[in-house]
């Protein structure tokens, strides 16, 4: 990736500001692919060896299980299934105004979508000078995911494909087409939500494996192809069937929104305020595809961190030695195998935990399959925590690029809003803060998952002792995942070992390894 040119040649800059801007661009230009969203430009010297942090975090997660088992002996009746948990807040006389505001937001979102397509097609070929890569990979995919998880699911309002489909469908009905533009084909029941799982893995492949994911031309092609697939699916099967089974973004943001403290009341007349994660305890019993989808949410973000560290180098080398015919300069084969392989490993690990739980319960609770279907939603907080840990620094630093890019979306030296000369503040967050935010996010996500699993077990089994017994294997799995995820997130951020030993630590785990302060 070449150094981008100056954004504006009409304004004179002081030598200091120009040097600072070029330094920022030089640093960002050295980051390949979609590492733009989660890079770390300095390392933090830990005050204690990393294994102490890992062991402490794992101990906190294990202790949360003990606390949940001992202190959550509440009446089972209070955990009965209800349409919504939480406190409802009515909108009052505002629905008309809200509908008008929602229509305006949907129109603006659709207009921004067209702007992204246009900038990707006709704008600068430099990803740092083009609005499309930053808006899609950083602001939307990373930023909106965290917003939805922390606040509520706003994606149905922002979804440009849904807005475009609804607009064309409404126009067709006004023109006398009774059925609108929907063909009314039946979505194959045998497929279930597996198309969404496949598309999530494909999207992750584009983000993590494909080396030109930030190239504006490739972004335009991917966006147009994705638009064609989504709109064709809704036309053939209807928007509800497509979004329920194949619209990966609708499903992804819906799952994250279940973790959020705010939700729309089922009647649409108000909001529901609830504890974070409460919405996951009232999710429907899942199918095999739902399990695969949630596991993909976990495995893909961990693969992102793993592939960005030193431990991935030996993996690629071993892959090339074992299968030389599949080796390639861009590491497509190794990256694809790693992405799918880690997903399969997580599936097997989760299934093994469910089999163990069924064994402890003596075949009750529907066996391993029933446990797997009911408890998979409790893993979502782990995905939220790791997503925050992995992308916190990148979102704060790289996300600032959208401010000047909105004034010059095509890289044509415009300054529409007077922000084209706003330079990213790379010192907005340091490695120390990033590290402790990462530790807190990972631990909080796993503790929340343990607590939710115990809530679901207590609701289903209606006996505190058996509920605790059912959660033991899942807690062991979560403790192990805490150690692995914290080790992976630490590798590019902190200095805890000499370089060769650091790679060995990441590749082979922490068992039996004693490190110094490095």
Q: What do these predicted ranges mean?
A:
Residues 484-518:
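Juxtamembrane boundary at the C-terminal end of a transmembrane helix
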Residues 387, 468-492:
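Final/C-terminal transmembrane alpha-helix of multipass membrane proteins
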Residues 450-478:
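Interfacial loop-to-transmembrane junctions
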């Amino acid at each position: 990736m070449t150094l981008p040119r100056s954004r504006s040649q009409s304004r004179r800059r002081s030598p200091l500001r120009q040097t600072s801007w070029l330094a920022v661009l030089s640093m960002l230009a050295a980051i390949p692919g979609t590492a733009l969203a989660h890079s770390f430009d300095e390392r933090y010297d830990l005050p204690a060896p990393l294994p102490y942090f890992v062991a402490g975090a794992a101990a906190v997660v294990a202790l949360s299980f003990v606390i949940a088992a001992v202190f959550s002996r509440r009446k089972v009746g209070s955990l009965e299934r209800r349409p919504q948990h939480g406190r409802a807040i009515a909108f009052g006389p505002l629905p008309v105004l809200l509908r008008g505001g929602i229509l305006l937001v949907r129109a603006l979102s659709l207009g921004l979508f067209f702007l992204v397509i246009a900038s990707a097609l006709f704008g600068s070929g430099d990803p740092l000078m083009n609005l499309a890569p930053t808006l899609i990979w950083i602001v939307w995919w990373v930023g909106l995911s965290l917003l939805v998880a922390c606040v509520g699911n706003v994606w149905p309002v922002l979804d440009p494909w849904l807005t475009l489909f609804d607009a064309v469908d409404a126009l067709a009905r006004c023109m006398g087409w009774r059925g609108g533009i929907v063909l009314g084909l039946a979505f194959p029941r045998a497929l279930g939500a597996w198309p969404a799982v496949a598309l999530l893995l494909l999207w992750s492949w584009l983000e993590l494996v494909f080396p030109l994911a930030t190239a504006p031309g490739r972004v335009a092609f991917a966006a147009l192809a994705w638009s064609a697939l989504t709109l064709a699916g809704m036309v053939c099967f209807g928007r509800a069937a497509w979004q329920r089974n194949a619209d990966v973004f609708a499903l992804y943001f819906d799952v994250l929104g279940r973790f959020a403290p705010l939700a729309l009341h089922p009647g649409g007349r108000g909001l529901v305020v609830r504890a974070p994660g409460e919405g996951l305890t009232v999710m429907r019993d899942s199918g095999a595809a739902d399990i695969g989808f949630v596991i993909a949410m976990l495995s893909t973000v961990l693969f992102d961190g793993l592939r960005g560290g030193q431990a991935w180098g030996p993996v690629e080398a071993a892959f090339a030695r074992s299968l030389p015919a599949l080796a390639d300069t861009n590491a497509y084969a190794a990256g694809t195998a790693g992405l799918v392989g880690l997903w399969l490993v997580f599936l097997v690990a989760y299934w093994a935990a469910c089999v163990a739980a069924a064994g402890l319960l003596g075949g009750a609770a529907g066996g391993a399959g029933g446990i797997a279907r009911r408890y998979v939603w409790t893993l979502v907080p782990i995905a939220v925590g790791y997503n925050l840990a992995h992308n916190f620094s990148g979102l704060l630093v790289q996300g600032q690029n959208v401010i000047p890019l909105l004034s010059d979306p095509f890289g044509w030296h415009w300054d529409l809003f007077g922000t084209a000369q706003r330079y990213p503040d790379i010192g907005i967050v340091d490695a120390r803060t990033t590290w402790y935010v990462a530790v807190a996010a990972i631990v909080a996500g796993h503790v929340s998952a343990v607590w939710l699993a115990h809530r679901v077990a207590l609701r289903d089994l209606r006996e505190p002792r058996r509920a605790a017994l059912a959660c033991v294997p899942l807690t062991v799995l979560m403790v192990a995942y805490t150690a692995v995820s914290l080790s992976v997130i630490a590798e590019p951020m902190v200095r805890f070992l000499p370089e060769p030993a650091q790679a060995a630590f990441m590749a082979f785990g922490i068992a039996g390894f004693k490190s110094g302060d490095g």
